Every structure is written in structure tokens, then in C-alpha cells.
């Protein structure tokens, strides 16, 4: 079992009951499912070949963002922003407290695991031909994971909102929706499909966008994980009202990983923030290193999903 230095968690005091937003047992309705069908059913290759490198020299990140904007525009034609916002406000099932779940692990001076569920990635291609998001998430929960991350981006990761809904039904852990969130429409959708936290990537958002999306998510009782890749992005992220800071060890343009990114940046994060190291964590030794650097949790997917039994791999990573 991996232990870590304790960080101050005063910022994660439980929310007042009155602040909980009313939500229903079925967070996603038919309109959202219908909107999701507008996504192109034939996503581009994710095998890292020519289709993942060209497009007028644009990076994989830029291509995914362009695709996401087009997808959201199409889905808004089916379910306009005003309508999906109204539906999100009507959800009555409480969120599960993503940040608080990590707080409990940190209080025990352990490094928590956010175990990821995804079918594919641009760098690795299809990870599991037998992909069953619900069963994978359940195996993670049994292995001792603190939270689950679900990739819902369709064009390069072959994910969908249906994956997240299936995971929510299968397990009781808090869920991070991992996607390229650029528009308020996606935040409302996240609440409808059952997400407890959303990922916001500093590299793809302008300052006013970031502030708007954080406020919207918080207003819907979801936590926000702000993802950074370098010191400049970290300094910007620390100015916002979000206590979850994710340090991504993957260069989103080259797709290479290096946990030295976390080792360099994590010590710069104030103790009242909770730090998550993302990507490139493969062994319990890696877990120990980032824990010693000040991380409260790690987000791991690919190294687990490559194993025959992802749950057993998660247990080994945690040192159980």
C-alpha cells in the first residue's frame, strides 16, 4: 500500500445539504441519447498512423477539439442549450462527491487511484476488443480504486456517453467524465449522464471559458479537475476556484509521457489543493514517486487496460 505526505483538505469540507442539487435516479433522458446519436458513427483511425499525424499539420489535440466543436453543434440542433440546461437543473440524484472521495484517501495518507475506463487512445489504438465498461469499472471498485474516469470522446478514443451511464449503473464510485469539454452544453450533458466531476484542459481553453465552465459545473454540484502540462498552465489554473489540479505527464502534441513533469510541478502546488498525476503511471514505484512529490492521487488507464484482468492490475498497482 502506498502512503503519501498529508496535504491540507480544509477546502473539501462537505457541502451544506441545502447546496445539494436535486437529481433523478435516471440522470440521462432520451433526448440526450438521441443527441448523442448525431455523432459520426465512423471515427478516424486511432492507431497513430497517417490519419493521426496529418490534417494540415495540426496536432492530435487540435484535431480532436475541432471535431468536438462540430459534434456539439450537431447535437445542439437536436437538443438546444436552453433545453438541456433546463433538464440538467431537474436532475435530483445527488452527485457522489469526487473530491471528497479523494479527501478520505488523503486523510489516511495514501495515494488514491482514479482508474480509467476507455476503449482506445490515439497513441495505443484499440486497448480491449472485448471492451465492457461496466465490468471493468466494477473490477476497479473491487480492487480498491477511489474513483473512476470514463473517456467519452468518440473520434479518437471510441468512447460515448453510454459508457459513462453504464459505469454509473454498475458501480458506486464517483465518476470523472474525461473529454474535451469546450462548451457549456457539454457541462449540462455531463450532469445529465451522471458525471460527478468533469475534466477541463487548460491548454484548450481561454481564461473566460475556463471561469464560465467551472462556475457552471459547480452550480450543478460537480467537481472540476483542472488539467495542466507545464508551469505556465499551472500558474493559471491556481487562480481559479477549483481545488483539484491534474498534472498530465503526456505531451498532447507528441503523445509521449514522462512522470518528471509531475515531479517538477507538484511541489509548486499549495497544500490546500489536491494534486492528481495523470498518464505514464505504470508501477507501484511510479506511484510512490509521485506520492512523495505531493500527489494525492493518480489517474491510470492504459497500463491497467492492457492487462488480462484490469482489476487485478489495479490491485497490484496499489500494493494490495
Report each predicted region and the residues it spans.
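Catalytic cores of alpha/beta
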Residues: 182-193, 232-240, 281-298
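Active-site mouth loops of central-metabolism enzymes
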Residues: 117-132, 174-181, 225-227, 277
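Glycine-rich phosphate-binding active-site loops on the catalytic face of alpha/beta enzymes
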Residues: 189-208, 247-254, 295-313
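Glycine-enriched alpha-helix->loop->beta-strand junction motifs that scaffold or abut catalytic
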Residues: 144-145, 170-173, 192-198, 218-222, ...
Amino acid at each position: 500500500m502506498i502512503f503519501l505526505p498529508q496535504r491540507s483538505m480544509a477546502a473539501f469540507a462537505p457541502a451544506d445539504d441545502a447546496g445539494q442539487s436535486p437529481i433523478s435516479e435516471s440522470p440521462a433522458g432520451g433526448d440526450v441519447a438521441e443527441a448523442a446519436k448525431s455523432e459520426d458513427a465512423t471515427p478516424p483511425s486511432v492507431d497513430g498512423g497517417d490519419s493521426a499525424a496529418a490534417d494540415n499539420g495540426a496536432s492530435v489535440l487540435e484535431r480532436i477539439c475541432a471535431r468536438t466543436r462540430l459534434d456539439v453543434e450537431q447535437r445542439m440542433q437536436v437538443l438546444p442549450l436552453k433545453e438541456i440546461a433546463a433538464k440538467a437543473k431537474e436532475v435530483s440524484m445527488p452527485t457522489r462527491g469526487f473530491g471528497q472521495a479523494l479527501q478520505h484517501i488523503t486523510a489516511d495518507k495514501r495515494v488514491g487511484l482514479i482508474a480509467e475506463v476507455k476503449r482506445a487512445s490515439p497513441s495505443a489504438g484499440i486497448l480491449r476488443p472485448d471492451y465492457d465498461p461496466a465490468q471493468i469499472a466494477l473490477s476497479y471498485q473491487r480492487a480498491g480504486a477511489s474513483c473512476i474516469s470514463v473517456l467519452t470522446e468518440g473520434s479518437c478514443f471510441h468512447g460515448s456517453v453510454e459508457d459513462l451511464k453504464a459505469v454509473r449503473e454498475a458501480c458506486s464510485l464517483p465518476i470523472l467524465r474525461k473529454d474535451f469539454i469546450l462548451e457549456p452544453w457539454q457541462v449540462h450533458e455531463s450532469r445529465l449522464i451522471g458525471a460527478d466531476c468533469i475534466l477541463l484542459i487548460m491548454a484548450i481553453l481561454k481564461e473566460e471559458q475556463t471561469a464560465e465552465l467551472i462556475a457552471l459545473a459547480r452550480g450543478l454540484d460537480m467537481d472540476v479537475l483542472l488539467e495542466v502540462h507545464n508551469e505556465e498552465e499551472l500558474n493559471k489554473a491556481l487562480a481559479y476556484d477549483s481545488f483539484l489540479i491534474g498534472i498530465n505527464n503526456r505531451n498532447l502534441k507528441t503523445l509521449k509521457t514522462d512522470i518528471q513533469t509531475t515531479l517538477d510541478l507538484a511541489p509548486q502546488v499549495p497544500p490546500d489543493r489536491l494534486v492528481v498525476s495523470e498518464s505514464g503511471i505504470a508501477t507501484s514505484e511510479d506511484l510512490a514517486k509521485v506520492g512523495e512529490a505531493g500527489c494525492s492521487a493518480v489517474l491510470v488507464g492504459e497500463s491497467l487496460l492492457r492487462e488480462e484482468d484490469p482489476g487485478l492490475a489495479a490491485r497490484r498497482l496499489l500494493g494490495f
